[in-house]
């Protein structure tokens, strides 16, 4: 199947990481409450610093979790090979209208929500890991300063996508997983990683309990729920 082919490709990458590149020390810590398996259904959040992060999640997850997918923009389907791969592998692809378009036609917002719901529900026919980079973009000191983020090593989280996924999938997932990736010797570029210039990578995995009030809320239209959800994510 397409997923087996993809996992074989990831397996080759992992073999290269383990046997060809200069040794990288992996320090992986997993919450005892996390019972990860290849048949599970997981929603996962992760900090985002480098393109290497995706390779790290693949390296970690190959024998522990189903193939990691993430929300992608529908427009990417028109990029040769990349877009087709996302589609074939069942990545949830979303059409999003601009704020200007929604202002002219508010019904488009609910059309976008319906598209997202269908994309998430499509995942439920199989084991999955759905990854959400809460920051929405890679962390840099410049972006942190511009945002005036209160967090030392994180940008302000964009919680809307997580709220949507939890409300659609929350009662049917086996765990909500928080992954933290740390590069103690400095954040590497993708080329640096494949040149073996990353001495150590730290990965911490923990289970996040989902409060009952989270499921069934309306992040878009309920200001009280939105504020409470944002505070939960910040904490």
Language model feature labels by segment:
Residues 77-97, 124-218:
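A cross-family acyltransferase "interaction/gating" segment
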Residues 13-18, 58, 82-83, 120-121, ...:
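Short amphipathic alpha-helical segments and helix-helix/interface helices
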Residues 216-235:
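Accessory terminal regions of nucleic-acid processing enzymes
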Residues 1, 101-111, 145-152, 220:
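Short, flexible/disordered intra-domain loops and linkers
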Residues 15-42, 56:
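A short, well-structured juxtamembrane/interface segment
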Residues 49-53, 111-115, 156-160:
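Short, glycine/acidic-rich beta->alpha junctions
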Residues 1-12, 36-38, 42-105:
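Catalytic core of membrane glycerolipid acyltransferases/transacylases, capturing the structured
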Residues 108-122:
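A Trp-anchored, charged/polar loop motif used as the substrate-binding/catalytic surface
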């Amino acid at each position: 199947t397409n997923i087996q082919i993809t996992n074989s490709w990831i397996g080759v990458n992992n073999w290269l990481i383990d046997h060809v590149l200069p040794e990288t020390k992996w320090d992986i810590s997993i919450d005892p409450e996390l019972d990860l398996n290849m048949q599970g259904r997981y929603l996962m959040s992760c900090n985002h610093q480098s393109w290497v992060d995706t390779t790290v999640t693949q390296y970690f997850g190959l024998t522990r979790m189903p193939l990691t997918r993430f929300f992608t923009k529908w427009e990417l389907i028109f990029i040769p090979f990349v877009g087709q791969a996302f589609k074939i592998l069942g990545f949830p692809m979303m059409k999003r209208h601009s704020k200007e378009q929604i202002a002219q036609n508010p019904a488009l917002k609910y059309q976008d929500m319906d598209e997202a719901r269908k994309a998430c529900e499509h995942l439920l026919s199989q084991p999955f890991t759905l990854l959400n980079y809460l920051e929405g973009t890679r962390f840099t000191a410049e972006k942190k300063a511009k945002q005036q983020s209160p967090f030392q090593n994180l940008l302000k989280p964009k919680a809307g996508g997580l709220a949507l996924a939890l409300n659609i999938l929350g009662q049917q997932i086996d765990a909500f997983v928080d992954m933290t990736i740390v590069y103690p010797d400095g954040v590497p570029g993708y080329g640096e990683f494949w040149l073996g210039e990353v001495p150590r990578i730290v990965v911490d995995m923990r289970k996040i309990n989902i409060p009952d009030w989270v499921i069934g809320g309306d992040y878009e239209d309920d200001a009280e729920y939105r504020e409470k959800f944002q505070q939960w994510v910040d904490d």
